[in-house]
């Protein structure tokens, strides 16, 4: 057993020995199906903390000759598959975490040299009796091992794209790295499976097509591997039952990723943390700074800022993902920025409607954090002041609520959407902080000149009143209250039994002044 050649199954053992392990071993059914075929080169891209390394460790434990893993798979789904024994622990596996090598090298050139030397060392230690033609040529030496032993190789590369993320503008270094991977992987009879993971898909790095033999499965198209991207809704529901967590709140905070022919997919790390810690909160920011998001949404592309505002309010935005070049520096318009945000996990993609939206509350908080410290004028101010507006509603401070709505409305009034949507954006922006305490529902009666938003307290905040906020134009705040009462508090409140605050807000199109009336109802 070497360090990189046939590394064993210790890491997979740690995963299945954890308090929460969700069985994703059926992925091996797919890799066995494409083993030593024209589809044997597989690249899976997902955001950070979506289980890429756990999957790679599982494949190493399954295929590697350096360990005996049959008992580790006892009780797991793949054990029942007819192909399980055929491929178990029978291959030479090179497991490479590319980030590890890059971190220890000052340049990509030195990284490639180091990688060659270390893999060659492991190969010679494992096979000291092989007659190597050129001990400095890794690919040729692997061919020598295969010819003289008959044992094929499986190559597993984790963080394959780290060069493109850390050397974003160094095209020469990127092409040098791709040339290495091509020489290492392409058209090699002794490699029967190559499995790479990263955040970015492989293709379209300029005109360089060194790795065009890979089938790619990404956050835009995951194909038959969709259910392995994260936790499915069925898996999350089982965890909620075991840990006595509220499924509705878990869905609002960590759900939202959609793929063809697959049930909803949840952020796995956040679900695990929520279960283990018994707390539904933002775990995304424990692994990724909002400054990463801020870099991209601050780009000066026409329409990008408006798109972000609309998505913060819950809208779906059309997007063209076809022109994205799969790097982190080449952006021609807002479509390329939005496509990158899909791959980073900050947006989810609806392949049927060809549109994007913010997947859940956890990610929506990241946008709010990024916008609040950006130079977005009144938008940033409105987000920062949203907690004050929320407190003003709780305290029935009508003047302060009117002022907060007026600030937010100033920024959203230019959006070229129908009036009801523009009004809902205003409420969403002015009361953004309410999402920490409430589940939020929108009711937009088309053509009626007003928008309702209903805020129902989360289970952990039973002392908070429900809120119904209605914004109208050129009517009266009192009329807005009457409108709410006539609607019997909206459908969203039919099952709610606590206190309710009704906030009716009206504004004049002529002078832009806002008035507010708040009434308390004991239901």
Regions of interest found by a model, annotated:
Residues 1-419, 434-437:
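Phosphate-binding site recognition
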Residues 144-149, 435-462:
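Active-site metal-binding core of divalent-cation-utilizing nuclease and nuclease-like domains
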């Amino acid at each position: 057993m070497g360090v990189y050649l046939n590394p064993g199954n210790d890491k997979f053992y740690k995963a299945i020995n954890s308090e929460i392990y969700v069985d994703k071993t059926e992925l091996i059914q797919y890799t066995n199906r494409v083993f030593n075929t024209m589809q044997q080169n597989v690249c899976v891209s997902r955001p950070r903390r979506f289980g890429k390394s756990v999957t790679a460790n599982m494949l190493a434990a399954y295929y590697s000759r350096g360990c005996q893993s049959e008992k580790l798979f006892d009780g797991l789904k793949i054990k029942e598959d007819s192909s399980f024994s055929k491929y178990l622990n029978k291959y030479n596996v090179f497991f490479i975490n590319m980030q590890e090598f890059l971190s220890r090298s000052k340049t990509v050139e030195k990284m490639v040299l180091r990688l060659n030397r270390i893999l060659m060392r492991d190969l010679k230690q494992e096979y000291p009796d092989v007659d190597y033609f050129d001990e400095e040529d890794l690919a040729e030496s692997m061919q020598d091992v295969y010819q003289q032993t008959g044992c094929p190789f499986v190559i597993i590369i984790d963080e394959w794209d780290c060069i493109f993320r850390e050397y974003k503008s160094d095209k020469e270094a990127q092409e040098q790295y791709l040339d290495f991977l091509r020489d290492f992987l392409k058209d090699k009879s002794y490699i029967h499976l190559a499995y790479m993971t990263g955040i970015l898909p492989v293709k379209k790095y300029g005109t360089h097509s060194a790795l065009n033999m890979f089938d790619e499965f990404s956050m835009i198209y995951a194909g038959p591997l969709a259910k392995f991207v994260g936790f499915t809704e069925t898996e999350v529901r089982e965890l909620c039952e075991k840990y006595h967590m509220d499924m509705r709140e878990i869905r609002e905070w960590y759900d939202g990723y959609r793929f063809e022919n697959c049930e909803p997919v949840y952020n796995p790390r956040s679900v695990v943390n929520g279960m283990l810690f018994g707390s539904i909160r933002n775990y995304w920011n424990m692994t990724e700074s909002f400054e990463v998001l801020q870099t991209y949404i601050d780009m000066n592309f026409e329409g990008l800022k408006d798109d972000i505002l609309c998505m913060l309010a819950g809208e779906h935005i059309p997007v063209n993902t076809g022109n994205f070049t799969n790097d982190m520096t080449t952006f021609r318009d807002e479509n390329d920025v939005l496509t990158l945000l899909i791959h980073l996990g900050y947006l989810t993609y609806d392949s049927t409607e060809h549109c994007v939206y913010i997947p859940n509350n956890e990610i929506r908080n990241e946008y709010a954090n990024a916008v609040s410290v950006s130079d977005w004028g009144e938008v940033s101010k409105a987000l920062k002041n949203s907690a004050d507006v929320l407190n003003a509603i709780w305290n029935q401070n009508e003047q302060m609520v009117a002022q907060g709505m007026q600030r937010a409305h100033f920024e959203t009034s230019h959006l070229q959407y129908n009036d009801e949507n523009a009004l809902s954006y205003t409420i969403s922006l002015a009361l953004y902080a309410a999402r920490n305490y409430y589940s939020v529902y929108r009711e937009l009666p088309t053509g009626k000149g007003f928008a309702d938003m209903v805020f129902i307290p989360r289970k952990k905040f039973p002392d908070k009143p429900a809120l119904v906020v209605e914004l109208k134009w050129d009517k009266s705040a009192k009329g807005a209250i009457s409108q709410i009462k006539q609607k019997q508090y909206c459908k969203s409140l039919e099952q709610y039994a606590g206190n309710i605050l009704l906030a009716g807000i009206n504004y004049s199109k002529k002078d832009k002044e806002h008035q507010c009336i708040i009434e308390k109802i004991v239901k």
